[in-house]
């Protein structure tokens, strides 16, 4: 069976989106299926129309050049047109049995055009509602024109594809509330391959010395620094934690839109000796940094996005036998059963975060 995956972006870029995609492709290939892959013009850094990475071949879509295509709203349709044009080029060559389009809805809409044109069944995988992420990133306003159009477009896609998959019950409930039959929606949860992680391994002492973490109790966060992750809240909780545990240290690994804000906040609070900020690190080194941490903290703020969507990072920490503390937003509550596989604290409350850390220690 030949499956053509229609993606926003892909490896070699590093993101939760690309890692989940890669895992899906690997598992489908283990089933003996042939997978093919195309990315939209939103993929960054393409150097050729066809690229190979990690044993996978990716067809890249052209980036729209016209100044007209840079206008708000119009630029989104330019992405769809570019993707449809590239699909028209490769469909006759690949002759896929199934189209598997992945969020966002722009991919789903382009795939829907092609599915009807070539009479190919279409599965749409919804990983999050991108209009909600856009609100957090500051590129859309909740209830604004772009927000409304994005939601309407994805609802249209939901209604017309052959089948829908999504990553959690929160998303399935929301999709069903739009009049989509529940039997059309399958939840395929976020997961990690435990064979790719080590369990309960001691921290590398050379790295501990380098980071200044020897004989310290280490809180940690490894991931992208988006506003909804709530990292400033974690910083606000540190002084109270330090009154009981002056040996505490916070290891922050990653980067993102809030990186400079977080660095400045660390400086303003005088926490340079407490917070170890590594920036982004090579993917193959991440395991060594996981092993440095005693408690992973995921202080996501309460909002529509975090209440609906389950994250991947807490599962990675669990797979390595690490303690997990997370805010009680809906996405976390779907993953974490208190005192069974983690701990929860009241979202948006730095005092409760600090109290829970102290109680755990």
Locate the predicted segments by residue.
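N-terminal subdomain of nucleotide-sugar transferases
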Residues: 1-57, 61-62, 241
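Conserved donor-binding/catalytic core segment of Leloir-type glycosyltransferases
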Residues: 4, 213-238
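A short helix/loop element that forms part of the nucleotide-sugar donor recognition site in Leloir-type
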Residues: 49-50, 198-213
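Short alpha-helical donor nucleotide-sugar binding micro-motif in glycosyltransferases
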Residues: 91, 158, 280-281, 288-293
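Carbohydrate-associated surface elements
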Residues: 170, 191
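Nucleotide-activated donor-binding/catalytic signature segment of Leloir-type glycosyltransferases, i.e.
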Residues: 253, 260-287
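Short hydrophobic beta-strand element within catalytic cores of glycosyltransferases
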Residues: 298, 316-319, 323-326
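Conserved acidic donor-binding segment of nucleotide-sugar-dependent glycosyltransferases
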Residues: 338-339, 343-350, 359-361
């Amino acid at each position: 069976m030949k499956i053509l995956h229609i993606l926003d972006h892909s490896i070699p870029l590093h993101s939760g989106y690309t890692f989940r995609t890669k895992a899906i492709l690997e598992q489908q290939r283990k089933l003996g299926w042939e997978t093919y892959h195309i990315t939209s013009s939103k993929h960054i850094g393409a150097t050729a129309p066809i690229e190979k990475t990690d044993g996978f071949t990716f067809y890249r879509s052209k980036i729209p050049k016209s100044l007209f295509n840079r206008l708000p709203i119009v630029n989104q349709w330019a992405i769809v047109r570019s993707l449809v044009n590239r699909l028209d080029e490769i469909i006759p060559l690949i002759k896929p049995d199934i189209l598997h389009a992945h969020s966002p809805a722009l991919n789903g809409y382009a795939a829907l055009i092609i599915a009807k044109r070539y009479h190919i069944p279409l599965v749409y995988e919804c990983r999050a509602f991108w209009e909600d992420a856009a609100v957090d990133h500051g590129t859309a306003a909740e209830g604004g024109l772009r927000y409304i159009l994005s939601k309407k477009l994805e609802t249209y896609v939901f209604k017309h594809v052959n089948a829908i998959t999504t990553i959690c019950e929160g998303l399935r409930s929301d999709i069903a509330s739009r009049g989509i039959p529940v039997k059309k929606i399958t939840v395929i949860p976020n997961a990690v391959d435990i064979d790719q992680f080590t369990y309960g391994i001691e921290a590398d002492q050379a790295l501990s010395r380098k980071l200044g973490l020897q004989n310290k109790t280490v809180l940690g966060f490894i991931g992208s620094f988006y506003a909804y992750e709530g990292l400033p809240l974690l910083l606000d909780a540190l002084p109270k934690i330090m009154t009981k545990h002056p040996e505490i240290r916070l290891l922050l690994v990653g980067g993102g839109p809030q990186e400079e804000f977080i660095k400045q906040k660390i400086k303003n609070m005088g926490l340079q000796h407490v917070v170890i900020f590594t920036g982004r690190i090579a993917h193959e080194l991440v395991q060594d940094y996981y092993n440095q941490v005693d408690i992973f903290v995921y202080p996501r703020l309460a909002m529509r996005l975090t209440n609906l969507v389950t994250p991947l990072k807490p599962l990675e920490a669990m797979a390595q036998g690490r303690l997990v503390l997370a805010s009680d937003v809906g996405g976390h509550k779907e993953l974490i059963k208190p005192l069974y596989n983690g701990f929860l604290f009241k979202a948006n409350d730095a005092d409760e975060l600090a109290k829970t850390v102290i109680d755990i220690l």
